[in-house]
C-alpha cells in the first residue's frame, strides 16, 4: 500500500503566518467559551482542530470568519477588523458544519456563489471554474441537478466545490496570493472513500500554498493528514504539535475521557489510534 508523504514538523513552517490568533477570549452570558487561545497557521500547512462536542472548536472557527468578533485574530499580516468583507472573501473561504438550502437551486448555481467576491457579473470563466471545482469533488455531470434531490454527502461535496471555486487560483496571475480555507467537520456526512478524498484534496491545496484549518472528529484522519494537531478542551488549547507528539494515550484520554492505545500505522507513516475500553 502506498505510504502517505506528510511533513513532520514540531513547529509551524518558517513562512509568514497566514493566520495569527493571540489571547483570544470569548464569553456568552458569563459563560467562558474560549480562553487565551493562541496559535498560528502558515502557508502550506494543514492544522486539524480536535476536541469533544462543545469544546469550542466551531466557536473558534466562527471567530476566524469574523462572525463572532474580529479581535485577537490577524490574517495575512493584518488585523481581521481592517479587511473589507469582499477583499477577505477572495482569499479566505469557510465551509460551515451545515449549509441548509430550502430552494431548488441547480448545483452549478450553488457553486457559482463562490465566485461572487471576484466580480459583479458572472463570466464564462466563472462557469468554467465552477465546473472544474465540481469535478475536483467527484461531481462532474451534476451541474443541472436540483440540489434538494441530492444525498447529504453529495450536498456537502457541492458546498466544498463552492469554497474551492471561491479560492480558485488564477492561472494567468504571475504570483498567487496567500489563501486560507476553514473547514468545519468537512467529512461528517461522507462515506469512507469520500472522507479520504476530501482530505487528500485539502493536502493538495496545501501544496499550492493554501493554509487549511479543519475541525475533525476522527482522530485517525487527523493523524494521517494533518501537519499539526490542536486540541481544544473547555475552551482552551490543551495540546498543539505534530500528530506524533499530540496524539498520545495520555493526552487523548485527558481531552476526550476515553482510554486508547496508539501504535504505528502498519501502512502509513502516522500514528494509529484504537479504543482500549
UniProtKB/Swiss-Prot annotation:
Mention one GO molecular function: ATP binding
Q: Which Gene3D superfamilies match?
A: P-loop containing nucleotide triphosphate hydrolases
What topology in the membrane does the UniProt record assign?
Peripheral membrane protein
- The EC number(s) this enzyme carries: 7.6.2.-
**Which Pfam families does the annotation name?**
ABC_tran
Q: InterPro entries given for it?
A: AAA+_ATPase, ABC_transporter-like_ATP-bd, P-loop_NTPase
UniProt superkingdom:
Bacteria
Name the positions where ATP binds: 51-58
* Record keywords: ATP-binding, Cell membrane, Membrane, Nucleotide-binding, Translocase, Transport
PANTHER family for the chain: HEMIN IMPORT ATP-BINDING PROTEIN HMUV (PTHR42794:SF1)
Job description of the protein: Part of the ABC transporter complex HmuTUV involved in hemin import. Responsible for energy coupling to the transport system.
| Name the record gives this protein | Hemin import ATP-binding protein HmuV
Q: What organism is the protein native to?
A: Deinococcus geothermalis (strain DSM 11300 / CIP 105573 / AG-3a)
Organism classification, top ranks?
Answer: Bacteria, Thermotogati, Deinococcota, Deinococci, Deinococcales
